[in-house]
Structure formats: C-alpha cells, structure tokens
C-alpha cells in the first residue's frame, strides 16, 4: 500500500502542475484569439449561444443580483462546467484484488525480431495477390490516368488505393511506366489527371466472376452476341452499371457480357478507332471518331438492326463512328423507314445475322471434305445451321461471286456526284451489278482487323472487322408482323420521316437540303480527296457544332432501346421529341395532343386496345417496338415517337393544335387495395388485378360514351390525373341498389394513332334486378319495423309502468332497443347491391352472422348485464309477479323477440344451405373433371404402352446402328422440306427443346427467349418468371387460408362465449326459484345446440387449411420465401401447432396398431403389451437381403439344370443309379419357414430371450449351440453327398487324364461342370484349356455347393468344408453383383461359344475347334418354353396349386377351355418340373414326345389342349393313389407337409405343444445361425473387393481407361449369327452356359432358325471336342457381322468390368494375365483396346482467377474424343513376347 500512496502522491503533483500550465496557456494571446475566432463562428451558426453569452455578461455587469436568480445562474454554470469536465474522466486506481486478477495472455508472433524482413514479406504477399489480368489492366490504364490511384481503383474489385500505390512503386523500375506516358508540354502549374469516364469504366471495369452453380444450366447469355456463357466454353461477367447508360439498358435488369465482346469493344475504344468498316483512312482530320449512333436506331427490331450493322460492316458492340460511317448509317435508316424496294428486298433475304467463328469454319471444311458429294442437308445437320447458310459461307470462303443475298448501295452514280448532288438520297436509282458489291462477299475476303494496324491510303479496303454472333433471330411470323407494321405506317406520310436526328447528315424533305454523301464511302473519299483537303476548315466547324450536340445526347448502340432511367433527353428545336415514360413514382407530364385530329386523318375511331395475355410465352407477346409500343403504353403517362406516329406527325399535330386548347392527361383509377401495384403499363406487363382497373374503352359503332365501373363504397376510387397533385377529400359512401355507371369525359380518353383494329368483346354486366334472399330478408325486416312502429304507443305505456317498478331495467331495455335499430340500419345498408366488375366482387353481398338481429337472452351485453350484481336480478321477477298486466306484457315482448330470432335463424339456415349446396356442386364438378382427366390419362398411358410394346423389337434391332449414327450425325427427325424459323436450330427441336448436350457448333442453338434480347420485349422489373408466379400463387392461397383460419377461430371463440353465457343464464334462472317460461329455455337450448353444431363444422373446416399449410411446409421447409406479416406468421405457427397436436393421437394409435399387428403375427405366443414397438434392425435387413439372394441363386440353378437335363433326355445305355439330390434351398424347411412374412423372425426370438431368467438363458443358449452344430453337420453331409453323386463320373479305376477328360465333355457334359470352379485356375493358367471353361468364371456357378476339381490332380476332386465355404462366398459375390440384365444375356451368349480367346491363351494356333456334326434333334421342331409368371386367371390358379410339392398335393389340376390357357399352364408345369430330377419330369416328357411326333408327321393334328387334358387325367390318378396309400410318410416329408400347412395357416401355431414349439425354435435358431454365417462371409467378400478396388494402381504405362458407364466391347466367338430375332430357342442350350433368370413372358412358339455350321479343322496338337454353338433368346439389337482374318474372330458384346480381364481382382486372374510389378520393365504385357464408346469423361480444371472469391466447382464435364466408335475391330494375334 505504501507504493500505491507514493504513486497517488506523485500523480497529484503532476496533475497540479498540469493544471497550472493549462491555466497559463489559456491566458495567452494566441489561445484567446483562437477562442474568439471559434466563438464567432459558433455564434454565427447557433444564435442561441450568442444570446446565452450576452445574458451572462449582462448579469455579470449588474450591480444588484437577486438571490434566487444568482443561485439559478450559478447552478447552470456549474452544470455546464461539470459537463465539459466530465467528458474525460480520471480513471480510478486498481485495488489489490483487481491487480491479482491480471493474467498473462500469450500472443505468438506479436514480437517482431526482424522488422525489415517482416515488412518485405508482407509486401511480397500483397504483390502475389495480383493476377496476370489485373497486372495488364493496371498497366494499360496507368498510361491514361498517370497517378490518379483513387480513380484507378474503379477498375478493380478488391483493390484499394494503397494496394495500387504499393504495386506501382514496387514495379516502377521493372515495368518502366513512364515510357507509356503521353509526352506533355511542361506546364508551370500542376494539373490533376483525368478521372475515368463512364464509357471507359463501362469497357474496362473488372467485375467479379459469375457463380455458375447458382444459375440454371445454359441460362446465362451474352447480351450482345447471344452465346451461352457457362464458364467452360465461354467466360463472362455481369455488365458494370456504367455500361447501362452507354448501351441504353434498363438499370433494373442484370445483363451478362462475354469476355470476347468486352475485349473487342475495349480494343476498338482504346485505339480510338471507328466501329464501322466504311472509312479507309482514319488519319484524316475529317474522319475523327466523334459521331454517336442515331437515336432512332434503337427503335428498330433486332433483325433490322443486325441487318444494318452487318451491311455497315460494324461490330455489334458499336458506340461511335466517323462521319462517313455515320452518314451511311443514317441513309440506310431513312431507306428502311421509307421502305425502299432495294433495301427491303435485302432485308427479306437477310440470313447473316449469326456470324461464323473460326472453329465453325474449320468444322465446315472438315465436313465438306468428308462428304463425297456436297450434301448440304447432312452438312447442315453436323453444323447445326441451315443448308442455305452453309452454302453461302462455303461460297464466301472460296471467293465465288454468286448473286449476293445482301446488296448494299454504297453511293449514287458518279455523274450525280459531279453534278453537285442534285439527286436525293432517298430516291432509289438503278445501277448495274458491277457498280454494286456484296457486303458479305467483301467482308468474307477481309482478314481480321488488329489494333494499331496502319491502313492503306488508297484503293479499296482489304481489312474489316469480324462480326460476332448476335441476338436470337426474329422468327418468320415476327417478320410478317414487321412487314404488316411497315405497311400500316406507310399510310401516314409524315410518320416515315420521324427518325432523322438533328446531327444527321442525311438529306431531309423538311429542310430541302441537298445530299452531302460524297465522303461517306471509300470511293467518294478516293475520288474527292483534294476537295476534302480544301474543305477542311468548313468541316471542322461543322464537326465542332455536332460534337457539342452529341456530348449532351445520350449514347445509343445497336441492341439498346431508349434509356428508361428517368433522365430527360436533349430538346432539339426543329423536331421536339416526346419524353419516354419514367419508372419513378412521379411521372412527368406528357406532351399535349389533339383529341380530334385522328378523325380528320382517316375517319376512323381508334378506340381499340391491344389485349395482352400474361400467360403467353415471351416470344409471342407483342413487343413495344415500332407500331406496337404505343398500344401497350396507351393508358400510361406518355409515349415514344412511334407511339404518336413519328416526329413529323408530332410536329404537325402541335402546329395544328390551338394554343388555348389543352388536352387532359390520361386517367388512372386506383383503389386502396391496388395502391402498391401502381406502375406504368409500358414498363411492365399489367397483372390481372391492376390491368383490369384501367379505363378500357369499348369499340362500338355508335357514339356511346365509355362506362367505368365504380368500386364498392368501402374502397372509394381516387381519380389521379397524371401531372397534377391528387386532391384528397373526405370519402363519402354512397349507396345505390342499382349498378353504378358514370360516363367518362371525352377529354380524359387518350387518343391512339396508327393502331391496327383490334376487336375487344365488352365484359357482360350481370343483371341484379332479380330478387335475392338478402333482398327478401330486407323486405321482411322492413315489414317488421312497420309493425313495431304501430305497437310503439302500447310499448311506451308498458315502459312507463316498468320504469316505476325498476328504472334500471327500463334503461337497459332502451339501450337494447337502440342497438336493435342500429342492427336494422346496418342490415339495410348490407342489403344494397354493391360490387365491381374489375375487382371481381359479387354485386350481392352475403349477410354476415354478426349483422343479424339477436334475441334478448342470447345477447352478450344483455347476459353480462343480467349477471351483474348491481341490477338486483331476484327482485325483478317478484315485482312482475305482483302485477299480472306486467306479466302479460313481458310474455308478449318475449314472444315477439322469439319470432324475430326464429326468422333470423331460418334466414341464416337458408343461406347456409345455399352455400353448402353451391360448395357441393362445385366439389362434384371438380371431382368429375378430375375423374375425366384421370380416365383420359389412363387411356393415353395404355395406348402409349401398347405402342411401345409393338415397337420394342424394332427399336432393339436398330439400337446399335442408331447409337453409332448418333455419335457422328444426329438423325433428321424434321423433314428437309419443313422450313424452320431463321436462327432456330433443327437439332434443338429434335430433342424437344432440351439443351442437355453440348452442341458441336461454337454458336449455341437459338432457344433463348426473345424477351431477353429484343429491344421492345425486354423483361420488365415487375414481371416475374414461372417460379415467382408459382410462389405468388401459393402465397395468395396461404394468406387466404390463414385469414379463413383466423376468422373461424374468432367465430369459434365467440360461439364458445355465447354457450358459456347461455349456460350461466340458464343456471341462474333455475336457481332463482322463480316461475320461468319453458319456451324461453327451449329457445336457449336450441341456440346452444346451433352454436355447438356450428363449432363442430368450424373444426371440420379448419382441417383443410391445416393440411394445405402442412403440405407447403413439407415442400419449402421455410415460410420466409413468402414474406408474410408478423400476424400471419403467428397464425401460421398456431395452425402448425394445432395440426401437430391433432395428428399426434393418430400417430400414436398407428404405432400401437402396428405393434399389435406385429404381436399377432408372432407364432411364439407373446401377448404382453409392455414390449416396445419392434424396429427393423440392420441384422433383420441383412437377413431379408440374404433370403432374396438365396431365391435368385435357387432360380439360377434350376434354370441351368433344366437346360442341361432337357438336352440329355435321350436314354443312355448304362444308366447309373439315380440318387435323390437335395439342393440347399429345397432341403431346409426352416429356411422356407423363415421366408414367410408372418413367420418367427430373429427379433421375436430376441424378445423371448430377454424375457427369460438368467438360468433359463444359459440353458437355452446351450441348446441353441448344440442344435446349430447338429444342423451344420447334417447340411454339410447332404451337400457332400450331392456333390459326390453329381460329380462322380465313373469308377475310380477308370480315371482319365486331363486331355481325355476334356475330350469326353461331349458325351457327359454335366460331369465336367465342376471345371468352372475356382480350383480350375491351375488348368487355365496353362495351355490347352477351352475358352468356354475360362469364360464361365465370369458368371455364377451352375450347381449349388459344387466344388471344382483339378483334372491333373490325383484325388477324386471332392473338396473340404473350408473349400466349400470359400467357394460359397465367391459365388455369392459373383451371383449378386449388380449387373444389368442385358449384360447377363450377353454373357450367356458368350458362354455358348467354344472358340479360342486370344486373351485367355498364350498361342491361339494350338487349339482349334472340332465339330462332331449336326445335332440329333431336327431343327424344325417347335417347342414350348417353360415360364414362371402367370398371365391369366387360370395361370394364377395353376401357380397356387404348383406351389405345393407334388408328393404333398392333395388336390387335382383344374381343367381349362382354351388353347392359350393350356399352353400357359403347361409351360408353368414344365418350369416346376425343371427343378425335379429327370425321372420325375412326366409332363415335360409327354410334351417333348408329342412335339417330336408332330414334327415327324406334320399332317397329324397337334393340340396343347389335348396334352393338358391328358395331364389332368394323370394327376387325378395320382390323387387317387395317394388316397389309397396307407404307408407311413418319412419324417422329412412329414415335417415338410407340416411346415407347409403351418405357413399357409399361421394361427395353428398356438395349438402346438411345448415340444413342437421348442423344435420350431431350434430350427429357427439353426436358420438364423446359418444366415448370419453366410452374411458374414458375404460381407467379408465385399470388404475384400472394396479394398482391392481402393488399392492404388501404379501400372501407369499400360493403364486401361475405365469410365464409370457400362462399355460394350467385343468378345471373340466363332458363331457368326449369335443373336437372333426370335424370342425363343429352337434347340437346347450349350453344356457350359447357364440359363439366366428372365422376367415373366408369354409362352410363345419360335419359328425354325437355320443354323450355320462351322467347318471342322484338324488339330495337330490338341483336339478339343465341344458342343455345337447355338443361338440364344437374347433381346438385344442385332450387331453387325465383323469379317475377320483366318486367325481372328468375330466380336460379341460383354461388359468390360468382368472378371475375365479385371485388374482389380488379381488373385482371380491367371499368371499370364496379371500385370507386372511397378518396377519390372522386362515382363510382357497384354494390351487390350477398350475404346468402345469413343468418349471418355475428362474433368476440366479451371484455375482460380480471383483468390478472394469462393468459386463453386463446376459439375459440367466436357466430353473428350478418344477415337471413333468401335467398328470392324479386329483382334491381332498376341505372341508370348507381346
């Protein structure tokens, strides 16, 4: 503390010294002068300070000061001093505890050890942020702005002035900026550099890159060249806001400009060169670039402007021109306005709107060279352009001077020029073809103009500007409209001269000036060069005058309309212009116009209006250009020049109009509800609610004044005259039962000039003179009021008597009578007809419930008064009882009120019934319409499905050819005779307007909406797209239901209070022990019931809004997109809470029902309700998936067994004893039991296990383990037995060698199936293995549980249990691999081939095919193929019967009536018999023998119905034998039958004994254990495969490209016609190929197919005896036959990802197929060409240009060609070295 005291003492001393120094400083003269100066300045700004100072001085000079005044002054001074001194308060000292609370905060890097190094590093880091584009931009702009760094910051996005200064001085020595500075004269005074202009910023400002992921695909388009800006093919940015003024674009719209247009325009602007192509020498002083585009040029359509710019040879991002180019441009504009024949013919034949890029020209040359003849139709399809356009470009590139499509008239004849230019420019003159030259031919021969390139001094020009691709072409129908508009405007002589500007050099008819066009072309400049030099001085004076005018005038360009930014245009004295309408809230006053002038012109009444369909596509809407713009803006604040017929017409109207006459401005009727929607019609398309409120004059033949519909009295219309201040007066409500119609003064209707006649049907007015329920109610109330007035004297006497008894009650009755009168007045007002045609409200307002007359006892105010204690309610009835007269009067009064209430209730009931009937009728109509639509949709769908089924096979055969043709040339779906609109891509229409694929042309198809590029049809700020319209509609529906919910809730609360009041009032009356009237209580009860019923209806009505709002919430998840008010959001929250509370009991009930259903399905007998709802576990899902896999595996085995056994139906000489083969899927009854949906599942057993006691759990676990072991041993024994009998070829003493086994495959192919197992890899790795065996590894094995054996091994080939488990896991992995059915069929076809594969052998010449001869079965036999799925009712009955095994089936087969049903049933029986041994196939043998007999004797009668009847008889005999048999069934069959019955009837499980239940549990435990083991093996195999796939492949030199999509590649085969068109096979399948599972198909008979027999070739080394190749029923397109070399083979179709050459599974490949080690360069390699599709997806990496902006990754992957499609691919022989 002593240290603190010393510190405090030192502080006080220093503070005192500071105060002394401060006082001395304040007394100095400098301080006083400073204070005096600032005091004077402050007092001049704030006079009250001066008054306060003078008051203080006056009080100080006073001799006597009163005590109170002195105190107040001193207090005020003290307060001021305290305020001044309290600004900086002295901080207090810290205490000991606060000082101990200080903690040390470590901040690494806060101490700089080497400041110079850190500073240098920071500078380098800041310099590294500069991209190359930013560096070049800074260097180019530095030369113009020197060191105005704050101005240079305008060109950058994220750079400050300090960054620019640092960059400048750090690169000053290396870049040498001073060499680019313009040399200036030395001046004495420093002159500030020029700040960047608006035009310069428009060209050079760097904009942030676009986030293409936030925009729809191919939705961004360059505003100038109309090419797609997607960030891959073409980059672009948003246009700077400064460019909107330069290019005359609406500032409310965001426009995109591509990088090419910006670079081209910036290059021309930087060099200060003319944008045109007609000036030959810009060094001349007369050709300075200082002329803007004429102001009227923006009024032309896009097509006309593109035509003029191409004729001028100018780029389309044009801003300024020289004098010759400007004169030529003005002359052509006048020719178009005057509709000269020559230029109109050129305009009609104009097709050069879209320019050709260099890539397109190269592609055109390639297509022409590849075409044997000049087939322009096919070339145009490849180019995505019109044939005529391709031919024109071809002629232009070859320099062929044919008849040009566009002819330009450079100037008049030389004779006319020499004579002094007497001929006018607009007069068409005939000239020879030699005097004219084609603009397209001249521009095609000119090279690309480069900046700062010197131009030739004399002769014609040889260089020109490259025209860019332009806007969307104008369709043919729009061109016709444009011609019609020109013809209409041609009737007005003065309208055609309104487009000449003041600064134009073109001749004019008004001033009669001669033509000054001598220097507007290179010819005129070359001929009159000397005259130009002599007239330099005169031209300079004219240019200076024109420059002054052009500076003030806004800059106009090609694709820009008039500026809508609200600025005023320059007012030219000779031709006054009409101001464009502004988008601001206060529009400027329009120009006056004569209302009667139109009648004197044509004698027609132009009171028609143009109807605009808001839902129409933008391309078909009338654009506000030329003659249609004044139609849209007819009811707005002004118009353009063309809206009033051109400048000449405007001037003529102003001259003919008297001075005193002034036309009234247009009138706009707006209501309070539509105040926010007030906007100009020509700026935005009117919405239905706003557009309907504008005055619409109807077209009539008589002089009937227009009728305006006045809105209801609630929303009094306010007539606002544009240009004048609105007068706000007191709104007075007028009531009239009839329709309110007021004539509008003729002066308020704006005149329309040069408007084509439009027929507008007037809106029919609905009559309201008929009687309505509301009017009848009004008359009834009026009669009641008259009766009450007649009874008023009697009631007054009663009231006097009542007042003597109870004055308070009398006052209450008087108040109630006043309320009744007010209600009647309100009803009278509500009964009047009010409404509006425009707003959509009905003329007959419905009566609200709260407006009805209420009864005395049901009134809330009356009940509240009666319930109040101060009125002494019990005393009143006693007083009435004492006077019988008063009692009678009271009863009469109550009865009257009851009658009134009854009438009111009846009226309300009638209205409610009418409303319900209307709603029911509307709902019925809507339901009928929906049913009709559904019926039509179903019929259309059925029709489409039928057509699709008919065309399936044809499309399949043409699929391969169509795919190959699609890669090169797309098919021409649109005939060549159909002429598409100009600029529309044919391929785009072929793909149904879906630009999903990248076009081959650099110019994209013109599928953009015209509203985005056309001048007159731009998308206004108020117009929304489809999504916004949908959101708006949803918002309206949402608000409508929210308000309905709010109203119903309020009504429900009101009814609830009413019910409570009635209950309370009834209880009080009954408790008062007074004699009361039963009728009153009856009425109160009735009212209570009505309120309760209404509340129930309200609850039902609230369900629909709640469901609708819940659906909207599920769709959007957030209501912020609708921008609701706070009250609506609260109501929305209440609705959702209410809906959730209502749905919660239903959800709980559903969960409980599901739980009870699950318990009922349990066969163990669990009935306890305390168990929770059982959820599906991952283990259960895995078991279900495994069951499905088992079913598929079982079907695959049966199909293969059927194919193998049907082929070997012929009896053998020495038949081996048949042993019953029990498959895994058939021998396990527990497995079939578990597959039943209602069977006991593992989760049920788990519940039982948890419910046991600990001792019982251990016992049950031991039993389970024992049973599992016994069951596994039994299954293993059965499987080994099956393998032994299925694979035992002969006795062990007669074992054959490997070669002999291969040779004996034809005799017993079923015995050699095991060679396809995994253990046969030893044989496959060597030589002499059949390719069919090697190829069979890529598909599933054919026999369950069969292990492969080695031929050269000394053992018998039987595998152990571990081998079996391993093989089972491998088979599961192969069988259930997600493969396409098409690929499965292809593999099946490949299996049938026994040819030699060069990929499987080292030397293909050592093995050759040996063919035994034709098959024994005739090729013409027709066979019935087995099918599984039923198609008819008989088939379904047959399937249910066949589901029971034959040895357990007690019922016989029902007979059928038709041949088709018999064929279906027989095919299903054949399918079921295929699962059984060959000895049990009775039906199959019967059908085969009948078919063979029919084939041997074609004349004999053959019918499948007779065969089926024979089968039915045999089945009946079998049933009789089973009934007569008394033998005891075997235990296994007995168990199967019992389990089958238990599956069909699960309820029998409850009747079982404990021992039977325990047995079932044990079987279930066995099945669960087996499934878990198989699932674990399957998961292990999948994990192993995933690890192998994820293993990095360092084999880079011969790495095979494997795209994600399935690739069809060739596989060798010797059978030429391996794919047939027939749907069924005529011969049996091969021995080594399984039959894959097919979808259910109808039994069909295939026609006999000729079989091509391969020739037999002798083999010197090894003879491989194989089965003859057979075609398969594969639904694939027919592939072309590939001719091969003698050692080559034809190709088949397969999947590249098969295990035959899969590098990802090296352990499954033979040694010669494994890839070598990464470092081993000596090992041989096998190369396989996988370029099958011709395209491989390659991701293009885009470098980040701006590090500070986060760019989303672009998901679009360009397609990179790696060669043509696989055609005529021939495999070469691969030697060992290769």
UniProtKB/Swiss-Prot annotation:
Signal peptide: none annotated. Residues 356-398 form the Myb-like domain. Its main location: nucleus. Keywords: DNA-binding, Nucleus, Repressor, Transcription, Transcription regulation. GO terms for cellular component: chromatin; nucleus; protein-containing complex. Residues 125-176 form the SANT domain. Residues 409-671, 992-1024, 1195-1218, 1276-1339, 1414-1434, 1646-1718 are annotated as: Disordered. Residues 494-513 have a biased composition (Basic and acidic residues). Residues 431-442, 450-469, 626-639, 649-671, 1276-1285, 1687-1696 have a biased composition (Low complexity). Disruption phenotype: Mutant animals display a progressive defect in locomotion starting at the L2 stage, showing delayed response to prodding, irregular thrashing movements and a low pharyngeal pumping rate. Worms have shorter body length, convoluted intestine and develop gonadogenesis defects including loss of spermathecae, sterility and larval arrest at L4 stage. They also show abnormal cholinergic signaling leading to early onset of paralysis in the presence of aldicarb, an acetylcholinesterase inhibitor. RNAi-mediated knockdown results in enlargement of mitochondria in the body wall muscle. In larvae, expressed in pharyngeal neurons, ventral and dorsal nerve cords, tail neurons, egg-laying neurons and egg-laying muscles. Detected in the neurons of the pharyngeal nerve ring, head neurons, tail neurons and egg-laying muscles in adults. Detected in male-specific tail ganglia and rays in males. Belongs to the N-CoR nuclear receptor corepressors family. Mediates transcriptional repression by certain nuclear receptors. Plays a role in development and neuronal function. May play a role in muscle-specific oxidative mitochondrial metabolism. This is Nuclear receptor corepressor 1. It comes from Caenorhabditis elegans. The gene is gei-8.
């Amino acid at each position: 503390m002593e240290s603190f005291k010393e510190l405090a003492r030192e502080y006080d001393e220093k503070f005192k010294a500071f105060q002394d120094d401060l006082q001395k400083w304040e007394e100095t003269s400098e301080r006083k002068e400073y204070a005096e100066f600032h005091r004077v300045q402050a007092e001049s700004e704030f006079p009250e300070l001066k008054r306060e100072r003078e008051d203080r001085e006056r009080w100080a000079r006073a001799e006597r000061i009163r005590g109170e005044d002195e105190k107040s002054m001193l207090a005020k001074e003290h307060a001021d001093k305290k305020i001044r001194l309290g600004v900086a308060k002295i901080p207090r000292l810290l205490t000991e505890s606060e000082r101990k609370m200080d903690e040390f905060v470590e901040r690494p890097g806060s101490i700089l050890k080497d400041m110079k190094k850190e500073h240098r590093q920071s500078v380098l880091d800041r310099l590294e942020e500069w991209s190359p584009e930013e560096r070049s931009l800074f260097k180019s702009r530095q030369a113009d702005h020197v060191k105005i760094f704050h101005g240079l910051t305008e060109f950058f996005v994220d750079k400050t002035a300090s960054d620019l200064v640092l960059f400048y001085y750090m690169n000053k020595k290396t870049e040498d900026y001073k060499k680019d500075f313009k040399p200036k004269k030395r001046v004495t005074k420093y002159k500030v550099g020029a700040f960047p202009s608006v035009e310069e910023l428009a060209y050079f400002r760097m904009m942030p890159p676009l986030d293409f992921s936030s925009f729809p695909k191919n939705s961004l388009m360059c505003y100038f060249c109309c090419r797609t800006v997607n960030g891959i093919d073409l980059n672009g940015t948003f246009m700077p806001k400064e460019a909107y003024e330069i290019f005359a674009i609406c500032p409310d719209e965001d426009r995109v400009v591509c990088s090419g247009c910006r670079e081209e325009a910036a290059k021309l602007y930087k060099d200060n060169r003319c944008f045109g192509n007609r000036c030959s020498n810009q060094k001349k002083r007369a050709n300075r670039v200082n002329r803007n585009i004429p102001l009227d040029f923006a009024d032309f359509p896009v097509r006309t402007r593109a035509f003029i710019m191409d004729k001028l040879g100018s780029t389309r991002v044009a801003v300024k021109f020289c004098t010759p180019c400007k004169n030529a441009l003005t002359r052509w504009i006048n020719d178009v306005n005057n509709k000269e024949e020559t230029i109109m013919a050129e305009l009609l034949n104009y097709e050069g709107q879209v320019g050709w890029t260099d890539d397109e020209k190269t592609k055109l040359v390639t297509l022409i060279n590849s075409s044997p003849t000049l087939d322009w139709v096919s070339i145009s399809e490849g180019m995505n352009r019109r044939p005529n356009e391709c031919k024109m470009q071809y002629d232009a590139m070859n320099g062929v001077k044919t008849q040009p499509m566009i002819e330009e008239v450079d100037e008049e004849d030389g004779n006319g020029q020499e004579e002094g230019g007497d001929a006018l420019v607009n007069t068409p003159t005939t000239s020879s073809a030699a005097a004219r030259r084609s603009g397209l031919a001249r521009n095609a021969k000119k090279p690309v103009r480069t900046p700062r390139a010197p131009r030739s001094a004399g002769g014609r020009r040889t260089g020109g500007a490259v025209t860019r691709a332009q806007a969307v072409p104008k369709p043919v129908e729009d061109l016709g409209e444009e011609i019609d508009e020109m013809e209409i405007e041609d009737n007005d002589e003065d309208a055609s001269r309104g487009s000449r500007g003041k600064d134009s050099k073109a001749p004019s008819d008004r001033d009669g000036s001669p033509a000054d066009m001598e220097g507007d072309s290179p010819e005129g400049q070359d001929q009159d060069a000397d005259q130009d030099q002599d007239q330099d001085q005169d031209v300079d004076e004219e240019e200076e005058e024109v420059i002054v005018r052009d500076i003030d005038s806004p800059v106009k360009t090609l694709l820009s309309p008039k500026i809508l930014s609200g600025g005023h245009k320059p007012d030219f004295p000779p031709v006054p212009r009409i101001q464009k309408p502004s988008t601001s809230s206060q529009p400027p006053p329009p120009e006056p116009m004569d209302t009667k002038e139109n009648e004197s012109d044509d004698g027609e009444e132009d009171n028609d209006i143009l109807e605009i369909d808001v839902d129409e596509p933008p391309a078909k809407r009338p654009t506000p250009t030329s003659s249609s713009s004044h139609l849209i803006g007819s009811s707005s604040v002004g118009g353009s020049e063309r809206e009033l017929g051109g400048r000449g017409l405007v001037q003529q109207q102003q001259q003919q109009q008297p001075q005193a006459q002034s036309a009234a401005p247009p009138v706009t009727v707006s209501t309070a509800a539509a105040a926010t929607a007030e906007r100009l019609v020509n700026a935005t398309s009117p919405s239905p609610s706003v557009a309907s409120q504008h005055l619409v004059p109807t077209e009539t033949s008589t002089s009937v004044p227009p009728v305006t519909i006045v809105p209801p009295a609630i929303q009094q219309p306010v007539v606002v005259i544009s240009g004048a201040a609105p007068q706000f007066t007191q709104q007075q409500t007028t009531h009239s039962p009839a329709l309110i119609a007021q004539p509008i003064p003729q002066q308020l209707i704006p005149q329309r000039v040069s408007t084509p006649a439009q027929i507008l049907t007037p809106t029919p007015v609905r009559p309201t003179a008929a009687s309505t329920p509301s009017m009848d109610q009004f008359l009834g109330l009026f009669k009641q009021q008259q009766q009450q007035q007649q009874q008023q004297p009697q009631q007054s006497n009663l009231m006097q008597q009542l007042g003597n008894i109870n004055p308070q009650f009398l006052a209450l009755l008087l108040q109630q009578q006043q309320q009744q009168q007010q209600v009647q007045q309100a009803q009278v007002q509500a009964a009047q007809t009010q409404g509006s045609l425009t707003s959509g409200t009905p003329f007959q307002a419905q009566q609200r419930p709260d407006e009805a007359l209420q009864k005395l006892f049901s009134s809330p105010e009356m009940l509240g008064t009666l319930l109040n204690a101060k009125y002494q309610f019990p005393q009143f009835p006693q007083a009435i009882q004492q006077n019988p007269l008063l009692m009678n009067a009271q009863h009469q009064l109550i009865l009257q009120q009851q009658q009134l209430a009854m009438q009111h209730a009846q009226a309300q009931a009638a209205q409610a019934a009418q409303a319900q009937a209307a709603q029911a009728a509307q709902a019925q109509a809507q339901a009928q319409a929906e049913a009709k639509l559904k019926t039509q949709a179903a019929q259309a769908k059925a029709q489409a499905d039928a057509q699709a089924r008919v065309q399936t096979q044809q499309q399949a055969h043409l699929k391969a050819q169509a795919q190959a043709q699609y890669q090169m040339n797309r098919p021409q779906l649109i005939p060549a005779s159909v002429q598409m609109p100009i600029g529309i891509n044919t391929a785009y229409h072929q793909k149904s307007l879906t630009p999903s694929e990248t076009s081959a042309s650099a110019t994209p198809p013109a599928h953009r909406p015209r509203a985005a590029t056309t001048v007159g049809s731009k998308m206004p700020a108020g117009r929304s797209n489809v999504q916004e319209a949908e959101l708006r509609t949803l918002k309206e529906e949402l608000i409508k239901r929210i308000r309905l919910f709010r109203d119903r809730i309020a009504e429900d609360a009101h009814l609830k209070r009413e019910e409570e009041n009635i209950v309370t009032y009834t209880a009080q009356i009954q408790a008062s022990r007074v004699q009361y009237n039963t009728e009153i209580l009856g009425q109160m009860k009735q009212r209570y019931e009505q309120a309760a019923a209404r509340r129930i209806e309200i609850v039902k009505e609230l369900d629909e809004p709640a469901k609708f709002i819940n659906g909207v919430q599920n769709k959007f998840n957030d209501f912020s997109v609708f921008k609701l008010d706070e009250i609506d959001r609260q109501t929305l929250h209440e609705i959702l809470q209410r809906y959730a509370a209502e749905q919660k009991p239903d959800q709980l009930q559903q969960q409980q029902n599901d739980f009870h259903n699950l318990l009922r399905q349990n066969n163990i007998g669990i009935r306890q309700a305390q168990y929770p709802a059982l959820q599906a576990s991952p283990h259960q899902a895995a078991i279900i998936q495994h069951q499905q896999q088992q079913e598929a595996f079982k079907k695959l085995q049966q199909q293969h067994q059927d194919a193998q056994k049907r082929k070997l139906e012929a009896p053998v000489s020495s038949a081996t004893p048949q042993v019953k083969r029990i498959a895994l899927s058939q021998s396990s009854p527990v497995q079939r039991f578990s597959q039943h949906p209602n069977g006991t599942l593992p989760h049920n057993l788990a519940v039982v296990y948890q419910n046991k006691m600990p001792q019982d759990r251990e016992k049950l676990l031991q039993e389970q383990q024992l049973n599992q072991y016994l069951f596994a041993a039994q299954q293993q024994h059965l499987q080994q037995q099956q393998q032994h009998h299925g694979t035992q070829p002969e006795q062990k003493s007669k074992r054959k060698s490997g070669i002999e086994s291969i040779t004996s495959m034809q005799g017993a192919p079923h015995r050699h199936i095991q060679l396809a197992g995994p253990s046969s890899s030893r044989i496959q790795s060597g030589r002499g293995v059949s390719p069919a065996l090697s190829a069979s590894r890529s598909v599933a094995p054919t026999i369950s549980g069969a292990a492969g054996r080695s031929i050269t091994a000394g053992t018998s080939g039987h595998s152990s249990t571990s081998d079996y488990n391993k093989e089972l896991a491998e088979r599961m992995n192969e069988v259930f691999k997600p493969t396409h059915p098409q690929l499965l069929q292809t593999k099946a076809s490949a299996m049938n081939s026994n040819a030699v594969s060069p990929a499987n052998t080292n030397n293909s010449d050592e093995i050759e095919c040996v063919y035994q001869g034709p098959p024994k079965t005739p090729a013409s036999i027709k066979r019935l193929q087995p099918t599984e799925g039923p198609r008819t009712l008989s088939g379904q009955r047959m399937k249910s019967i066949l589901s029971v095994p034959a040895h357990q089936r007690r019922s016989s087969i029902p007979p059928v009536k038709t041949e088709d049903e018999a064929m279906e049933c027989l095919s299903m029986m054949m399918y079921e018999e295929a699962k059984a041994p060959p000895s049990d196939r009775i039906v199959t043998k019967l059908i085969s023998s009948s078919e063979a007999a029919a084939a041997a004797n074609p004349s004999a009668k053959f019918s499948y119905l007779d065969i089926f009847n024979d089968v039915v008889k045999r089945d009946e005999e079998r049933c009789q034998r089973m009934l007569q048999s008394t033998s005891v069934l075997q235990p296994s069959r007995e168990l199967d039958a019992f389990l089958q019955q238990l599956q069909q009837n699960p309820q029998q499980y409850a009747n079982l004994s404990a021992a039977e239940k325990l047995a079932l549990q044990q079987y279930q435990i066995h099945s669960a254990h087996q499934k878990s083991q198989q699932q674990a093996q399957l998961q292990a195999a999948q994990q192993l495969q995933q690890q192998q796939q994820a293993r990095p492949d360092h084999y880079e030199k011969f790495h095979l490209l494997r795209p994600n999509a399935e690739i069809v590649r060739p596989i060798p085969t010797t059978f030429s016609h391996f794919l047939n068109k027939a749907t069924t096979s005529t011969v049996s399948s091969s021995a080594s190929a399984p039959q894959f599972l097919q979808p259910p198909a109808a039994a069909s008979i295939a026609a006999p197919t000729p079989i091509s027999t391969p020739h037999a070739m002798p083999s010197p080394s090894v003879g491989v005896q194989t089965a003859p190749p057979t075609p398969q029923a594969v639904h694939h397109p027919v592939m072309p036959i590939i001719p091969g070399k003698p050692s080559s083979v034809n190709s088949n179709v397969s999947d590249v990802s098969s295990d035959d050459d899969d590098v990802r599974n090296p352990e499954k490949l033979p040694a010669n197929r494994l890839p070598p080690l990464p470092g081993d360069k000596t090992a041989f390699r096998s190369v396989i060409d996988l370029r099958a599709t011709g395209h491989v997806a390659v991701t293009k990496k885009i470098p980040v240009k701006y590090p500070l902006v986060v760019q989303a990754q672009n998901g679009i992957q360009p397609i990179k060609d790696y060669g043509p499609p696989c055609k005529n691919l021939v495999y070469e022989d691969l030697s060992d070295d290769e």
